Amino acid sequence: MHCPFCAAVDTKVIDSRLVSDGSQVRRRRQCLDCNERFTTFEVAELVLPRVIKSDEVREPFNEEKLRRGMLKALEKRPVSSDDVETAISHIKSQLRATGEREVPTKMVGNLVMEALKRLDKVAYIRFASVYRSFEDVREFGEEIARLQD
């Protein structure tokens, strides 16, 4: 790794530790030329499957799109941003665990609904009403009744 201070090529690792949930390694490094110390974080590059939309168009998984959809459903609800980020990480892990190169948007939507159901029931209903295209109040009532079972 190049030194960020003098751009030297030779640096050495002086300390390594697991951080977060064990998915990151924090390394303290020292430049062998200028002796400055700096920290790096190492994470595995894990590829998420492509998403197959309802019109059969394939596109890369878009974490920002997932986040926006969840935050829209959770707007003005008492859910912390840490909880949202944890849910997003869990959804991404579930998608990776499929081992598939491509997954349908329906699978992603169902994972989001499961996560929202755990986080906040009102947000779940908001998301489900758009995702499932509720036509009338009866469909809202049926979904609420299923939540209460």
UniProtKB/Swiss-Prot annotation:
PANTHER family: TRANSCRIPTIONAL REPRESSOR NRDR (PTHR30455:SF2)
Annotated family: Belongs to the NrdR family.
Pfam family, one: Zn_ribbon_NrdR
Keywords noted in UniProt: ATP-binding, DNA-binding, Metal-binding, Nucleotide-binding, Repressor, Transcription, Transcription regulation, Zinc, Zinc-finger
Bridged cysteine pairs (disulfide): none
GO biological process, one term: negative regulation of DNA-templated transcription
InterPro entries, A to Z: ATP-cone_dom, NrdR-like_N, RNR_NrdR-like
Protein name as it appears in the record: Transcriptional repressor NrdR
All residue ranges annotated as the ATP-cone domain in the record: 49-139
Origin: domain of life: Bacteria
Function according to Swiss-Prot or TrEMBL: Negatively regulates transcription of bacterial ribonucleotide reductase nrd genes and operons by binding to NrdR-boxes.
The keyword Transcription is assigned to this record: yes
Signal peptide: none
Alphabetized GO MF terms: ATP binding; double-stranded DNA binding; zinc ion binding
Record text on cofactor binding: Binds 1 zinc ion.
Zinc fingers (unnamed), renumbered ranges: 3-34
Cofactor(s), names only, from the UniProt record: Zn(2+)
